[in-house]
Amino acid sequence: MRFVRKNENTKRYVDNIFSVVRAAKADPEAINATAGCLYGEDGKMFTYRCVFESEAKITPAQRAAYAASPAGNQEYIDLITDFVLDGRVMNHYKAMATPGGTGAIASAVNTCLDEGDTIIYPQISWGNYRVIADERNLNVLNYDVYDLNDLFKTIDEEGEKVFLVINSPCENPLGHAYPLDEWKQIMDKLNSLDKEVILLCDIAYIDYATGDPKAYFELFNEISDNVLVLLAASCSKAFSYYGQRLGALIAINNDEEFLDHYMNLCSRTARATWSNLNNAAMLNIADILKNHREEYNEELEAAKGMLKERTELFIRQARDCGLELYQSADGFFVTLKMKDNDERDAYHKRLLDHHIYTIKVNHGIRVGLCSVPLETLDGLAEKMKELY
């Protein structure tokens, strides 16, 4: 007897990341560059003091309570939306709370795509995009983030509806970011299409980018009527609050009536999927955004400075020893270039044999600079080059 649905994905699910993370934690000699979480220079998970001082004030009754609705608490929704958009979007928008950035992405996929539809995301990308696509029985098209012509060619291959995922800035795993002039070209292309276009921007790491990473949001004020922009935001990353599972989905469109309809659809899907949300986490983040922004901003700048030091050190030493990396702008990760995945697998094993724990990605090896203290990182590129 099968019992399960006929169109199930029968491939055995193995999480490539967490299995390596477990192995690293069990190895006392490990150099652990597996994590997608931010760690401090003391080797412990980085936490924002203001986040947990605020959380300590939440009562047991508040922790135990349901959120106001499947879409979340309105105060949190309003504050997180203002925080994410940063005054850049004058177009119509609506938002809802989600269980992490993954919840936002899954909600976007579940409400916009039918089985057999196509999702477009980068060739080298976060592995969970594939899991979400397979779970929904979607077709997949990929594009090269370093080649706009390849992106546009891929978009043109799609028929009646384009569902495009862009993870920028601080792309996982490459650290890639589209500059503003390329964003303008992307939006010009999407606005010119005579079909439905859903642009899903995975902005999980945006708060750790340098410069003006939200400048491209202003382009969403001049979208065509056939374009729906969805922003998937993550409190896990922004507030180093991973286990509490909180994020937001923000929808931007020219038609306010449609947005009301869309948020109703998202709320119903949420009720049928996760039912409710983390009330205490929403109360906490709302309090931080309302009453402790200055403290948060100071701690965020310290975290960004720590990441910048690590990134500059590793990239400089990789360049000096000839360890080839994909071009990186910002973020938690850098990725080594691999000729093919067979070469990648063999190299990854050599690294493991020498207690260097990293994550395999398509045609690459992801190095989580976010999780390696500067002292440990110093000289790591040379060690990895010796094993290449």
Task: Say what each PLM segment does.
Residues F163, I198, L230:
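Hydrophobic "anchor" residues on beta-strands that sit immediately upstream
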Residues L79, S224-K304:
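Conserved core segment of the aminotransferase class I/II
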Residues L300-I315, E324-K337, H363:
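Conserved glycine-rich beta-strand-loop-beta hairpin in the small C-terminal domain of fold type I
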Residues A61-K195, I206-S224:
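Conserved core of the PLP fold type I
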Residues A30-N32, A232, E324-A329, T358-V361:
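Short beta-strand
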Residues I203:
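Walker B catalytic acidic pair
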Residues M1-R2, D82, R88-M90, N341-D342, ...:
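PLP-dependent enzyme catalytic core of the Aspartate aminotransferase-like
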Residues T10-G100:
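N-terminal small-domain helix-loop-helix segment of the aminotransferase-like
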